């Protein structure tokens, strides 16, 4: 359930008050009237922040919009270090670089050890060797990429007929044995209309199960391999990778994503007659290895034991360079600390930066954090994560108590000059690394980003630095930094779910 609250609330309040004043009788309104409740929104005595703190929010916001540091850090992370698949040399280099940068900012840095899988992509090739109307002696290439955690084919590949289905239900309804030995394609189109309306994450969620468990489901019915239509809205004949999981006791069959264009091609050809494919995937699953969450504390001036956490995940997929997923989230979270340092601002509570390791391949970094800090969660005032790219932020999404809306209204008002004043409450936590904390009662927040374009590039070779708009990146940094400061310096903590 998502509830959108229109903002800036104080501007709305003044508008309603003005209309009321023009038409109201001269008599004094009764206590606790609608006017009283609206007036309370503008009563500074009822807020956790003073006028000076509001001014500081403005300073942070304005500095974020002109400071090039967020983009410069993101450029180094993506261009110089590159893709950061869990277990890779690049992932380790990223850990060391981020830790060094945070030490330069004057934070107390901890490397928190966690165990990560080590899966390595190999050869990827798919060709049609038979289809209706094929010219003799020809083949037809299909653009394919292995899903993370996929089992391999043999080095020579496997050749089998392709079976196209639109849903789990359709595959389940087929006669027993009909799936055996086939290459199954789950062809569920990505909802571009929903995405164009700004609900890309919802469109993604509708199809996620096909990538996540489709190969396991197909394997349980005897499929030789499973293909999924890429989860993305781009029409560039680029496949989108992502993690797949196998159930216990089920044969681990090779699993790959193909482009939307190729999925449509196979669907059309299959209606005309048999289609045969030779599929070659040679990934390797190596023994698990060690990596690290990077934790950096900007110590609180009065209550250092109380923590406001800002975060993004440091690992990425290996097809692109992980600029929007989630180098941007890491960079804008680092920028929160940089801005506080450069402006010499020391909030009452500690602001903790975390670069999560292994979000893409099983969230082991976040799991380790929960285990290591379980006794401290009472003192975690809030947890923020950015993991939906860095297009224009419309405001804040918060996961938790409905009462937090009134608490956050002044913060949204401080973000109104950059068009980021809408508050949205959601019962569903969409930020994976902080989800465990939120379930245990820690208030969670994320920038609400325009997701119309994000899934065109997500998990694909097109996730590169050129997709980042510098101004919009800075807007996201402003949202993260202003919110973190407000939560860390307020006289009251944000309400927790009861």
Report the location of each language-model feature.
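N-terminal capping segment at the start of a domain
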Residues: 48-88, 238-243, 315, 387-391, ...
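Short helix-loop-beta-strand segments that form the rim/entrance of peptidase-like active sites
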Residues: 72, 338-364
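Noncatalytic luminal/extracellular "stalk/propeptide" segments of secretory-pathway proteins
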Residues: 29-49, 53-55, 75, 79-196
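Second-shell loop/turn segments in exported
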Residues: 57-65, 79-89, 160-165, 174, ...
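Soluble metallo-hydrolase cores and metallopeptidase-like ectodomains found primarily
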Residues: 56, 130-131, 143-176, 244-323, ...
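His/Asp/Glu-rich mid-to-C-terminal helical/loop segments that flank catalytic regions of hydrolases
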Residues: 338, 342, 455-498
């Amino acid at each position: 359930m998502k509830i959108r609250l229109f903002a800036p609330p104080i501007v709305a309040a003044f508008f309603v008050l003005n209309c009321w004043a023009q038409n109201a009788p001269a008599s004094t309104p009764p206590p606790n009237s609608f006017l009283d409740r609206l007036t309370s929104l503008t009563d500074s005595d009822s807020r956790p922040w003073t006028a000076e703190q509001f001014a500081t929010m403005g300073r942070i916001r304005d500095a974020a919009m002109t400071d090039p540091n967020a983009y410069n850090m993101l450029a180094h992370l993506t261009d110089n270090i590159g893709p950061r698949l869990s277990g890779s040399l690049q992932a380790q280099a990223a850990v060391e670089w981020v830790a060094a940068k945070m030490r330069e900012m004057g934070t107390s840095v901890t490397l928190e050890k966690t165990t990560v899988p080590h899966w390595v992509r190999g050869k990827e090739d798919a060709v049609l060797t038979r289809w209706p109307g094929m010219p003799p002696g020809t083949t037809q290439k299909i653009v394919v990429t292995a899903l993370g955690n996929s089992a391999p084919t043999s080095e020579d590949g496997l050749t089998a007929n392709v079976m196209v289905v639109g849903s789990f239900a359709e595959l389940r309804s087929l006669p027993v044995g009909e799936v055996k030995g086939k290459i199954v394609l789950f062809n569920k189109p990505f909802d571009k209309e929903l995405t164009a309306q700004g609900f890309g994450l919802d469109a993604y969620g509708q199809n996620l199960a096909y990538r996540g468990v489709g190969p396991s489901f197909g394997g349980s019915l005897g499929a030789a391999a499973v293909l999924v239509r890429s989860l993305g809205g781009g029409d560039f004949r680029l496949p989108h990778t992502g993690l797949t999981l196998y159930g216990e006791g089920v044969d681990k069959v090779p699993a790959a994503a193909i482009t939307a264009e190729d999925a449509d091609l196979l669907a059309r050809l299959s209606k005309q007659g048999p289609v045969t494919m030779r599929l070659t995937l040679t990934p390797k699953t190596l023994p698990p290895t060690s990596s690290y969450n990077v934790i950096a504390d900007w110590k609180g001036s009065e209550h250092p034991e109380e923590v406001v956490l800002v975060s993004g995940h440091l690992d990425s997929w290996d097809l692109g360079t992980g600029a929007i997923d989630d180098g941007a989230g890491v960079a804008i979270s680092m920028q929160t600390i940089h801005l506080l340092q450069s402006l010499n601002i020391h909030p009452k509570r500690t602001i903790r930066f975390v670069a999560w390791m292994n979000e893409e391949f099983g969230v082991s970094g976040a799991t380790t954090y929960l285990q290591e800090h379980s006794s401290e969660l009472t003192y975690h005032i809030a947890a923020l994560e950015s993991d939906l790219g860095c297009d224009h932020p419309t405001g804040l999404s918060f996961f938790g108590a409905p009462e937090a809306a009134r608490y956050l209204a002044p913060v949204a008002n401080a973000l109104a000059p950059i068009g980021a004043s809408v508050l949205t409450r959601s019962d569903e936590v969409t930020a994976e690394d902080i989800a465990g904390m939120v379930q245990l009662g820690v208030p969670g927040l994320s920038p609400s980003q325009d997701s119309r374009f994000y899934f065109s590039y997500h998990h694909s070779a097109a996730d590169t630095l050129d997709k980042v708009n510098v101004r919009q990146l800075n807007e996201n940094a402003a949202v993260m930094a202003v919110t973190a400061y407000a939560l860390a310096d307020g006289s009251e903590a944000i309400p927790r779910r009861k």
